[in-house]
Amino acid sequence: MQIIVNDTSCLIDLRKAGLLHAALLLPFAFQIALPLLRTALLEFTRAEIEDLIARGLAVIDLPPDSVGRAITFRSAYPALSINDCFSMALAESQPGCILLTADQNLKNKATSIGIEVHGVLWVSDQLESSGHTTYEHSMAAYAS
């Protein structure tokens, strides 16, 4: 199963659109780096986080070499937040995975090192093509 590494912006956007639970039904293994869960998802309640984990969101504790890589990214790309760098390091450590982000700086840097990157609209397309939602439902969700 292909892995999708999430940054927080896409999880928040999918939640606001009411599509986060449906996204976790897609045939991908969804992951988030542990530091993001502890710092950037503060607008999610503990119960919401536990529910997402129960639905299949894997929280990955980065090994020391990935933490080191994130710090290297942070030094090389000061426009990226440390959380962006954790996401990029996690994605880089798993060849063939997808990085899901809405952050243009992160998209550009990740693409430049060979990571496949998509955003929320790609998830909407996946939901529609898999029958988990319709185009009309997705557009109504984003309009609200």
Spans of features found by a protein language model:
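Short active-site oxyanion
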Residues: 1-3, 28-30, 93-98
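Non-catalytic interface/targeting segments
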Residues: 4, 9, 14, 63-64, ...
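PIN/NYN-family metal-dependent endoribonuclease catalytic core
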Residues: 5, 14-66, 122
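Short His-Asn-centered micro-motif
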Residues: 6-9, 34, 101-103
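Acidic, PIN/NYN-like endoribonuclease modules and their adjacent C-terminal/linker elements
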Residues: 34, 46-48, 107-144
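Glycine-rich phosphate-binding "P-loop"
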Residues: 67-78
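Acidic, metal-associated active-site segment
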Residues: 81-98, 105-106, 141-144
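Short hydrophobic alpha-helical runs that function as membrane-insertion/retention elements
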Residues: 98-101, 118-119
